[in-house]
Amino acid sequence: MVSSILKFVILIHSTFHSTFAQNLPDTTVAPKTKRTIKIGIAAAQRTQTSSIGWSVCGGAVPMAIERLREFGYVKDFDFEFIVDYTECDQGSVVRAGIEFIKTHKVDVIIGPPCAQALRVMSFLAENYKKPVLGWGFVSDTDLSDVIRFPYLTTVIPNSLMLGYAASKMLTVYNWGRVAMLYYYSDIKYCSGVMNDVEATFNNPSTPNVNIVIKAEIYLNDNETTDIVFQSVKSRARIIFWCTQTAIEKRDYLIKIATHDMIGDEYVHIMLSMRNIAFGAQTSLGKPTFSQSGLTPIWESFTEGTDDFEKMVKQAATRMFVLDVNSEVADKKYLDYLQKNIMKAVQSPPMNCSTVECMTANTTIMGGYARQLFDVVYLYGVALTNTNSTDPAVYDDVDVIVPQFVTSFQGMTGKVVISPNLTRMPIFQLYGLNSDYEQVALAEFTYIDPIMNVTLSYKEEGGAVWYFYGNSRPLDIPICGFLGKFCPISFWEQYMILAIVSISVIVLMVIIMIIGCLCVISAKHAEQARTNAEWQVPFVNLMESEKQIRSNATSRRSLQSAPSISTGHSGVTTVSDFCENYTMMMYEKEMVLTAKYQYTHLTKADKERFVKMRKLDHENINRFIGLSIDSAHFIAVTKLCSRGSLQDILSRGNFSMDYFFMFCIIRDVAKGLEYLHKTFLRLHGNLRSATCLVNDSWQVKLAEYGMDNLVEEQTPPKKRLLWVAPEVLRGSLSVSQMEPSADIYSFAIIASEILTKKEAWDILDRKEDCEALIALVKDCWAEVPEDRPTAENICSQMKGLVSKQKTNLMDHVFNMLEEYTSTLEEEIEERTKELTLEKKKADILLSRMLPKQVAERLKAGQTVEPEGFDSVTVFFSDVVKFTILASKCSPFQTVNLLNDLYSNFDTIIEQHGVYKVESIGDGYLCVSGLPTRNGYAHIKQIVDMSLKFMEYCRSFKIPHLPRENVELRIGVNSGPCVAGVVGLSMPRYCLFGDTVNTASRMESNGKPSLIHLTSDAHLLLLTHYPNHYDTSSRGEVIIKGKGVMETFWVHGRIDDIAEPTELRSICKPSTVANERWITPPAPKPEIRSVSSHGSRPPSVYDPLQDHRKFKMDTLKVAN
């Protein structure tokens, strides 16, 4: 498709150019003795200058002509060269081609040196039958298609053949996993080569090749290149790569060396179509390969060195080149060509004077200059072989093109052109020998459809893998790409056995060492085990925001109880319980902690803590342990949720009777008695703040045994109130104190309990508890020997109360029972009042909602919408109510409707009909829901309607005795849906077209008549035949429904007694005689009515709709 478009564009362009050329003057000159051959050259000046630039390649053209004449060719021809710098641009190529053919009338076109541009030139040449010779980056496979390009000849094999040669090479060396890298360029030469090679690898006819990575790298982008090489290192060891210039080739070798990819595992195979292999085309006079006559790639491109020679040379030993046969027979002339090619382009007949030609590097020949030489040489050989005296023969493309099928020794080796006008694909695999000379290791020749290989060595190891230790690398290393799968060595395999053997030798020494260590460690272990009994790791203590005071609610049992005794309750002392203790979590339980300054713990202290852990008494707060691995010592004890005794007494918001005080004092005395009998001998820090109270109102002594620990904060002087006088005078430590000091502290605590005030306030107590007071006075005697012991205190207290009252909790429960009995009568009184109010609320609720719905709502249940197959809906409206209301004051209007609807409500209750709502003079009722009643609903509604009419005839307005009240009633039967809508002020609503139609019956009815739909009339006659007197009204246009036949109900048959004349007055004759104006039908809408409250705007209101309809009717009538 693309080629067809190009041909069309070329045809249009050539037609225009032919028309334009007809007006040019005739410049034809008489033929000379020698035939002048005009050669059009489409060159590139600034595109890939180092490879195909005219400044470094163009000199090959005159030098090829000179070489042809040396060998006796083209003696009868002169040459004229027309050079156009198309820069591989397709538009420029078309222009240049037309000028070559039409204006300059060239005999042959050389170039352009790019694949896509060459295709355009070939299409143009085919149209004008001109031969085209290709060189440069023209190895694309499709250029070898002689059918598409019959006049195109190239001296380069196509890259598809290179892919077959690469596939054959992988088969020879048993490789199947490869990576493919190539340098980026604008003309995408290497990209095309790699695509063709990849296509051959994926061809089913070739052995399977796994391409693990294919990536593009950049000459000056080291960051991207680093990422690519890191990926290659982890996935492949056989790497195909492609470059366009010698600079890129040398850059690649430097990069693999810097990335440590030149080890014995890596094989780098360069794919080339330039006949250069390991060489570079320079004229610096540096050493050359004897095989190709080119300078080795590791030599710098300057006259000096660049310090990379050694690195590149080492990297080249891991490199192979798969290239077109590059062995040049005449290496001297190749050297001459390299030295003089830049001079030749500037000299006649080229005479290139552009900036590029004048400033070109004179040391490096263009990469594809030798191909340009061979192209010109091929054309000269073809001209000579034509050997015709007829000048017109040389213009006949069908004669000259077959002469291109020939062979000769060129500057790119032996050139053999096949019948498809491309060079015969003869590839060679080049490597370096031990002398760093380029040698051919294998030759690949394609004989359709097989790629044959001829090895140039007998022994592979030394010839091919000399630099690899004579061993062929694997495409997958034995140890894997990351070195994690290496086989286990002998030492690694038997390491455990060797270690065991060595261990046996030194076992005796180890046993001796262990024996000594065991004695030491056992001692330390025993010490650690002992310490672990009382040590609490600080990490196991978690702070809690909850404070002891938050447990005040736990004391509600006594705080809420009535007062049992009278006394002072104005204690204002604030407890320091929360200041002394902190609540924390330890092993998922709340505990109390107290901080002490860090100090040295003696062995006696540690032994004391172990024994304290074992203390167990109901009036001793259990010591859990001590944390010593933080900045402070933290003592951990069991939590008493009611706080300290001082904290309870300081609040003073409940009363304590004699027995309550007795039990608390007794618990303190029992705790002291237990401590005085233990190894501790005494408490030493007894005060009301260290007497803790648990949930059962049981007192437990805390902060005992902390003799040598100093509190974190300086204790307030207030604590000295509980210290015995002899301790204050002598500044005694706990270890120097006697148990009598605790007795003194006990007396102070007892006085606090008795007075519910601070210490030393016992004289203000007015209750009669002389025995306890006498005991307290004995305990705070000045002389320690006069104070009773803790055991004596307990024995004396046993006789202060009767044996029946020994438990404080029983006493508390008795107090609560007395309080409960006083509440029962009050509760019974309140219950009666609540029952009465509940009945009133139920009555009010039943008037607002159906009973079943109300019961579900009271139970907290949701009321799901319910569908009813058959119900009868009733609508009524007071006729001319607006006129009546205008004659009444607002209060008279309300009284009028109240009198009327109160009697209507009585009639409704008599007929089992549910009243949904009434708004203004509108009235809505329904029968058949929420309790289904079969088909009795039509009878109930009709009977109720007749009763309404009967009542209205006798109803008189007190303040308007001459005015009568008339109703207009509409009835319809059918299905509907009912449900509760809303949460605040819920409403029982009806939904369905049945409701709307009933409203239309009312609004289209007549005063004092009952208007029925055909459905309601059929239901009435079907189930209650001969019960009611009805008549057809005829067909009426109903808003939103169209034409409907409706009916009148005049009364029950047994009740009708009016004369026929009255019937004829009330019964309309036909619809045609009625002047009834009907508004247009409304749009479909959701219709619903509710049982209570005002309607939201989103819910359809039949009452409002039929009232609006009535007002619209009046407006039209006026």
Swiss-Prot record:
InterPro entries attached to this UniProt entry: A/G_cyclase, A/G_cyclase_CS, ANF_lig-bd_rcpt, Cyclic_nucleotide_synthase, Kinase-like_dom_sf, Nucleotide_cyclase, Peripla_BP_I, Prot_kinase_dom
Glycosylation sites: N222, N351, N361, N387, N420, N452
Reaction equation(s) it catalyzes: GTP = 3',5'-cyclic GMP + diphosphate
Keyword set includes Lyase: yes
Keyword match rRNA processing: no
Residue ranges constituting the Guanylate cyclase domain according to the UniProt record: 872-1002
EC number: 4.6.1.2
Record domain Protein kinase: where: 558-875
Membrane topology value: Single-pass type I membrane protein
Protein name as catalogued: Receptor-type guanylate cyclase gcy-2
Taxonomic lineage from the root: Eukaryota, Metazoa, Ecdysozoa, Nematoda, Chromadorea
